[in-house]
Regions:
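N-terminal hydrophobic/helix-forming segments and targeting peptides
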Residues: 1-468
């Protein structure tokens, strides 16, 4: 007769804490994450991530994709889309009409963007006007050291790269907030309006431009001094900001968090943690059965719109170009493809337990989270992966001894969220979300588990290498 304990063992399931099941995993995970932290520190924007990724790809033997060229199994290629997104592939032994293994992450993150006409002076202080990008909680972005990143196109067409606040000795920038002594009325605001969008103004200077040859000072001398310093550094004028993409991001570096150093704290881990693990898994794939397609896309945080986001056709066009190398039917390629939408999920936070449904939440240190659907209010705006797709991806991870878990994004009707999965599915592919659980998502300092990061890499590698 079967005992209750035997039945419990055979019929029930709980996702384990990785370190309790595999004590040897810590060393490999910690070593892998050193490279991840270093990459994060030098790739805070989508342009920087693309450039750094291309450096790693070139060092690993990847070459730019050429239309009309014949490729053989094991060949490695990449395609850069307008400097802000990219796709890369390792050719497999199976014909392209059998489908590809597609893994899509995004490399943009919430931030403060400059408005097209940003520079102004107010009561002898110089400021930048900003328009926030993505779903930020605005109150989190005040009194935080910020760095200036981006590009400016000068009148003569020259592209100037801008970066201030990242190197030792650089100045940083800041959005101010009220002192508590004068904050009584501000305290009456709802939390979402504690800081308003038009209050996210960045301090850039407080000293005037002084011309000793003139007896009377010029108008807006503080603003002029800031512009003069930028002109000295980069040769730009105020008019050039209209031809610019300037982003302000936290000036902090990726750091270990906790006495046991088990967590990583850094800006932009949504979704650069999945982008980095996808990139390294792609590079480490040598002889796949299916041709791999790893996509690092832009604009996910604002709906994937624009020609560098996955709501455009740039990935479809890349796949069409791949198909053309073998004269393959693109519809068969798409229909037979299995894909991952590699994006983070919100890890269970016991300090705010009421917004989660614990049984269907994801937790740190239990591995990458397989998210069947996102959306809200009846799964609206979701892909909702099929049982067959779930079974295939789970089987691949299980056969590779990958720790993983399932999870939703919060309790029903508590909120919403989306990924690129629905845009991948729109190309007639089977797709499911898989990514790292994150604490403090969309804040200037997000937290991830080193064990989760490492096993996400292992999950992606298993997915790309599997012949299932």
């Amino acid at each position: 007769m079967t005992t209750a304990k035997e039945l419990q063992k055979n019929l029930t399931w709980e996702f384990p804490h990785i370190a309790k099941k595999n004590t040897a995993a810590k060393e490999a995970a910690f070593a892998y994450c050193e490279g991840y932290k270093e990459f994060l520190n030098t790739a805070k924007t989508e342009r920087e991530f693309t450039a750094k990724a291309v450096e790693k790809l070139a060092a690993a033997g990847y070459v730019p994709f050429e239309e009309g060229k014949a490729y053989k199994p094991g060949d490695k290629v990449y395609f850069v889309n307008r400097g802000k997104s990219l796709a890369m592939s390792t050719f497999g032994t199976a014909p392209l009409e059998a489908g590809v293994r597609l893994n899509a992450a995004h490399i943009d993150s919430p931030r403060l963007d400059l408005k097209p006409n940003p520079v102004y002076e107010n009561h002898e202080m110089a400021y930048f006007k900003t328009h926030y990008y993505g779903g930020i909680r605005k109150y989190q972005w005040v009194t935080v050291p910020l760095a200036m990143h981006g590009v400016i196109i000068k009148k003569n067409g020259e592209l100037v790269k801008v970066c201030v606040g990242e190197n030792a000795g650089d100045p940083v920038f800041c959005v101010t907030d009220l002192l508590p002594h004068l904050g009584a009325k501000q305290n009456e605001r709802k939390l979402g309006e504690g800081i308003k969008g038009e209050e996210l103004n960045i301090v850039i200077g407080s000293l005037p431009f002084v011309d000793e040859s003139e007896e009377e000072g010029v108008k807006d001398a503080i603003k002029l001094n800031a512009l003069a310093l930028l002109n000295e550094m980069y040769g730009i004028t105020e008019h050039d900001f209209m031809r610019a993409e300037i982003e302000f991001v936290p000036a902090t570096k990726a750091q270990d968090v906790g006495l046991d150093r088990s967590l990583i704290g850094a800006y932009g881990q949504d979704d650069k943690v999945c982008a980095y693990t996808a990139l390294t898994a792609e590079i480490d794939t040598k002889a796949p059965y299916y041709t791999t397609v790893t996509v690092l896309a832009d604009k996910e945080e604002i709906g994937s719109y624009g020609n560098t986001g996955l709501n455009s056709d740039f990935v479809l066009h890349y796949l069409e170009d791949l198909a053309a190398t073998q004269g393959a039917n693109i519809r068969k390629l798409l229909r037979n493809t299995t894909a991952l939408s590699s994006d983070v999920n919100g890890a269970y936070d016991p300090s705010f337990a009421s917004v989660y449904e614990e049984r269907n939440s994801c937790f740190v240190n239990k591995g990458p989270v397989l998210t069947k659907y996102t959306g809200a209010r009846g799964k609206s705006g979701s892909n909702d992966a099929s049982a067959e797709t779930m079974a295939k991806v789970i089987s691949i991870m299980d056969e590779a001894d990958v720790f993983w878990q399932i999870g939703e994004l919060g309790a029903v009707d508590e909120g919403d969220g989306g990924t690129v999965a629905l845009y991948v599915a729109a190309m007639d592919m089977d797709v499911v979300d898989l990514g790292v659980p994150i604490l403090c998502m969309h804040s200037p300092f997000e937290l991830s588990s080193k064990l989760d990061v490492y096993y996400t890499y292992k999950a992606f590698a298993a997915f790309l290498e599997s012949s299932k």
